[in-house]
């Protein structure tokens, strides 16, 4: 097997993707970002610096609602920046919540986006405010290092670690993995925090990544059965906690999951992680590093559309990857242990923990904002000002007010009542299990609406559910504005992926447990066609389903859609 890694080579192969040259020549991710930030003539930075900026946790964007008008006025696009804050396991203190709230009000668009990877996200930050925003994030003892880019992204885990000692231990492992796999370059501290500059960066080392980092982004998540809330099979490395007699003994490991694809290119597809074995818990950080280095060394650096670890595993085979992992570890991973998932959603409302309480708040599509009739942002700040526990950002874009002492429970409940905050139980099962990415107006990749549209589409689907007697039925529905898969649509029972404004591909047949990919049902359809397609299916499901049968299972059993056994069959 040929090692295709070039991160230690003095000269790069001319066939490599241009991003490989950019990384290699970036002076360990510095580029000319400082000079771009200092340029007062434009609200943008150079395209090369915009690519490197992702490693620092920020994307350059523009307001796509204003593009045409500004073009007519011969103005440059309305540039702004998104910052994604790294929050391993989604854990934040009340003080950190208040700091994030302040940043959103001072520098962003007065909203906070809770992402599907348990991170904070700010939109609408102007170039002149970017550095101060980064500093303020750092003052809150958070950062945006490696929240984006060709590195390990925010490490996920079950968001309610105070339910038991096991959950707390899981969160600690998520933090250890995240910190261990951070880039070691000093560039972030130099550019954003006025840190002491490295006089000769040629002396700098990236002991894990090398100077070209990974071929593409890399994602790790930890699930605690029976909850698959992190969608463990969507991760490059999935870790499934194995608990015996209330003690965490280790993890089952899956490799090569991923959601993204490109419309029209069948060589790209979503894929489920493959279960390869069991490891003791004390070995988990080393195992994650060794798997990541296999992708570093053998991942495709010539074609970024096929550069994710899922394609490496598919190309080399999971048996070969497992044997190579064993070789690098110097010991063999064991056979996987038994486990079972029940769902991939959140447990909403109050949940009693060990000497404390946790309240999971339903936040539609993760957007924390105040509206005329729902002062969510104000309410959460009031809670943060009195809360003595933690906040936990959920993989389903909800928020856990965690570790609430019995003495504080009544006080927090009073704020919940005052602002009419919801645990989602007044909503349909469909809305409670919905997710959408940001899409328009800020995401440069969006082909169609998502976050701004899904709630109103659900309202219309709810009329069909009412007609079918299914309003309380738990059904997962997800929407993205492009096929990159940020809301993990390929795992949903019903999914919509944007093709053009107002047009979507419709997918059916994912598993309620997050264990099966869905498949395309109809292509390039509008809202009327969506509703016309769903009505007979929901009516039939209502009348013909088996006891306890979920919608995704029904459409496969009924022959509406073929079952997908492997991502390589996704388009067939």
From Swiss-Prot:
Q: What sections of the protein cross the membrane?
A: none
What are the binding positions for [4Fe-4S] cluster in this chain? 437, 443, 482, 486
The UniProt annotation places siroheme binding at: 486
The reply on keyword Cell division is: no
Give me the comment on cofactor binding: Binds 1 siroheme per subunit.
Query: What cofactors are annotated for this protein?
Result: siroheme; [4Fe-4S] cluster
SUPFAM superfamilies for the chain = Nitrite and sulphite reductase 4Fe-4S domain-like (SSF56014), Nitrite/Sulfite reductase N-terminal domain-like (SSF55124)
Supply the enzyme class, top level.
oxidoreductase
Q: Which GO terms describe its biological process?
A: cysteine biosynthetic process; hydrogen sulfide biosynthetic process; sulfate assimilation
Q: Which pathway does it take part in?
A: Sulfur metabolism; hydrogen sulfide biosynthesis; hydrogen sulfide from sulfite (NADPH route): step 1/1
Give the CC-aspect GO terms.
sulfite reductase complex (NADPH)
Question: Which UniProt key words apply to this protein?
Answer: 4Fe-4S, Amino-acid biosynthesis, Cysteine biosynthesis, Heme, Iron, Iron-sulfur, Metal-binding, NADP, Oxidoreductase
Reaction(s) catalysed by this chain, per the record, are: hydrogen sulfide + 3 NADP(+) + 3 H2O = sulfite + 3 NADPH + 4 H(+)
Q: Name one GO molecular function term.
A: sulfite reductase (ferredoxin) activity
What Enzyme Commission number(s) does the record list for this chain? 1.8.1.2
Q: Does the keyword Iron apply?
A: yes
The UniProt entry, under HAMAP family, shows: CysI
Family, similarity comment: Belongs to the nitrite and sulfite reductase 4Fe-4S domain family.
Question: What is the role of the protein in this entry?
Answer: Component of the sulfite reductase complex that catalyzes the 6-electron reduction of sulfite to sulfide. This is one of several activities required for the biosynthesis of L-cysteine from sulfate.
The annotated subunit structure for this chain is: Alpha(8)-beta(8). The alpha component is a flavoprotein, the beta component is a hemoprotein.
Name of this protein = Sulfite reductase [NADPH] hemoprotein beta-component
Tell me the organism's taxonomic lineage: Bacteria, Bacillati, Bacillota, Bacilli, Bacillales
